């Protein structure tokens, strides 16, 4: 696989959802499909920022059962995670042979910009799907059937680019005892491998805990952390998600940047809200760093001011921060991450992250 191609959300109002991410996260309009392009079933607004592409889809009629069932059960959420691949037919054939449920067989769509080959299978959880995309013979910005004559957002003329570059990983949450079957599906069907894992002995707070396995494709350009709750005194944030999403689904999307301080400063100025981190986290961090040979290039006072978390080992470090939920329900949120020679997933920050989310769970009456 060549990486993530795009992520598709099914939402109640595609125009308004896309506009939110344009205004708050600094995305730009990329493409549109709807009545004006001959699509009588769905309106889809596609936005982008550097190599990140997100599509938001809503139906144009009230008789689409799949959409109605999805919204009745889940509400707004990620419907499809698409991968950029070189050989759609081969990956699809191997996946179906290994037990994947086909949604749409390999097919080509074309316009004046060229040809795109696509195929879709069900993922191992919920109604979420995976689409394989080969755009090697396509010069357009997204897909045939879309118009690229879309308005530039006025905010882009008065605000600076945020600097989010690509999708680093996509995280899904599952009910207890469901993580391992999902991991095994990715190993068997897509030939992914186990890249990283933690269990409840490592990741726990006073009240709750989790288990997580990250699976990756052969190139390790696609990474999918898979979480499940573990037994605790109270309800974990993983179980809270499963309860409110009414099943397994995508919990958060991590967006990679090369300058997290600049990106978070701009996102905050745009109105994005983030989880807060207590001062004790940074006091403890400074003490630990005194006994480490690792040099953090960024100013710790600035990281503390912005509530950015740090995880590190002897070779490098990562900086990460998590938005508050972007839906009314405690389901989807985003992570902003900067990697400095570090391929981990912030295991050292899981406890702090869990405690921050638990403080919010308590205000929601869900802890």
Curated annotation (Swiss-Prot):
It holds the Pfam family Glyoxalase. It is an enzyme of class 1 (oxidoreductase). Its EC number is 1.13.11.27. Its cofactor is Fe cation. It comes from the Eukaryota. GO terms for cellular component: phagocytic vesicle. One of its GO terms (molecular function) is 4-hydroxyphenylpyruvate dioxygenase activity. Pathway: Amino-acid degradation; L-phenylalanine degradation; acetoacetate and fumarate from L-phenylalanine: step 3/6. The keyword Translocase does not apply. Fe cation binds at residues 169, 252, 335. Residues 3-135, 166-324 form the VOC domain. GO terms for biological process: L-phenylalanine catabolic process; tyrosine catabolic process. Keywords: Dioxygenase, Iron, Metal-binding, Oxidoreductase, Phenylalanine catabolism, Repeat, Tyrosine catabolism. It catalyses: 3-(4-hydroxyphenyl)pyruvate + O2 = homogentisate + CO2. PROSITE patterns: VOC. Binds 1 Fe cation per subunit. Disulfide bonds: none annotated. Belongs to the 4HPPD family. Key enzyme in the degradation of tyrosine. This is 4-hydroxyphenylpyruvate dioxygenase.
């Amino acid at each position: 696989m060549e990486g993530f191609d795009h992520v598709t959300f099914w939402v109640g109002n595609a125009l308004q959802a896309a506009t939110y991410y344009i205004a708050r996260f600094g995305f730009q309009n990329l493409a549109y499909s709807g009545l004006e392009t001959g699509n009588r079933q769905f309106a889809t607004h596609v936005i982008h920022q550097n190599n990140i592409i997100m599509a938001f889809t809503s139906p144009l009629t009230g008789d689409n059962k799949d959409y109605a069932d999805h919204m009745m059960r889940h509400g707004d959420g990620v419907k499809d995670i698409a991968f950029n691949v070189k050989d759609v037919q081969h990956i699809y054939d191997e996946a179906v042979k290994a037990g994947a449920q086909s949604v749409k067989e390999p097919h080509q769509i074309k316009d004046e910009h060229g040809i795109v080959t696509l195929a879709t299978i069900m993922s191992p959880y919920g109604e979420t799907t995976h689409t394989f995309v080969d755009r090697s013979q396509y010069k357009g910005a997204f897909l045939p059937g879309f118009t690229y004559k879309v308005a530039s957002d006025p905010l882009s003329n008065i605000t600076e680019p945020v600097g989010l570059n690509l999708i680093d990983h996509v995280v899904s949450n599952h009910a207890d005892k469901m993580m391992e079957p999902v991991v095994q599906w990715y190993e068997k069907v897509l030939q992914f491998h186990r890249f990283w894992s933690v269990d409840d002995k490592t990741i726990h707070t006073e009240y709750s805990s989790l288990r997580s396995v990250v699976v990756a494709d052969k190139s390790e350009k696609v990474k999918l952390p898979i979480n499940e709750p573990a037994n605790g005194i109270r309800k974990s944030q993983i179980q809270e998600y499963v309860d409110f999403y009414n099943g397994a689904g995508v919990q958060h999307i991590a967006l990679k940047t090369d300058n997290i301080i600049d990106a978070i400063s701009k996102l905050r100025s745009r109105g994005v809200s983030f989880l807060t981190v207590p001062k004790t986290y940074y006091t403890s961090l400074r003490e630990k760093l005194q006994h480490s040979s690792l040099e953090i290039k960024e100013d710790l006072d600035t990281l503390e001011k912005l509530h950015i978390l740090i995880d590190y080992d002897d070779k490098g470090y990562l900086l990460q921060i998590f938005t508050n939920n972007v839906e009314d329900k405690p389901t989807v949120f985003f992570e902003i991450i900067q990697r400095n020679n570090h391929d981990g997933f912030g295991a050292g920050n899981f406890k702090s992250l869990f405690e921050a989310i638990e403080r919010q769970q308590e205000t929601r009456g869900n802890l």
